[in-house]
């Protein structure tokens, strides 16, 4: 499957819909879930989406970074129907490059 890795912030609706197709959502407490998700999406410093040919989001990576030395991946998920196709690895490579990569 061909995917494009996009640097973009997901809307709360997009992210919640994606969570239904992955096990990633199980990490979030149920209390005030819909209230907290917009803040999570707004405050993350790095947000990537893997999008297939039809425009469907099939992978997500979010993290915190200083864009110089460090990257902390907080969320990495792939659609259950698309696992074992290298999508997570593509997201990690793109995140590493955007966060500073190996420049030294």
Give, region by region, the residue ranges found by the protein language model:
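Conserved acetyl-CoA-binding loop-helix of GNAT-fold acetyltransferases
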Residues: 78, 84-97
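A short helix-loop-beta-strand connector motif used in the catalytic cores of GNAT acetyltransferases and
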Residues: 38-49
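Conserved beta-strand in the GNAT
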Residues: 49, 56-64, 70-72, 77
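Short amphipathic alpha-helix that is part of the acyltransferase structural core
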Residues: 1-30, 54
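Short secondary-structure boundary/capping segments
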Residues: 7, 38-40, 97
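Short, intrinsically disordered, charge-balanced linker/junction segments flanking boundaries
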Residues: 100-104
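Short, basic/aromatic recognition patches
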Residues: 32-37
């Amino acid at each position: 499957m061909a995917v494009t890795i996009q640097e973009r912030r997901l809307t709360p609706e997009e992210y919640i819909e994606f969570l239904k197709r992955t096990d990633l959502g199980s990490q979030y407490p149920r209390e005030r879930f819909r209230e907290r998700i917009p803040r999570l999406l707004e405050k993350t410093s790095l947000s990537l989406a893997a999008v297939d040919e039809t425009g469907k989001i099939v992978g997500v990576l979010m993290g915190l970074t200083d864009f110089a030395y460090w990257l902390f991946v907080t969320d990495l998920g792939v659609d259950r129907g698309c696992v074992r196709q290298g999508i997570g690895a593509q997201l990690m490579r793109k995140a590493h490059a955007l966060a500073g990569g190996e420049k030294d």
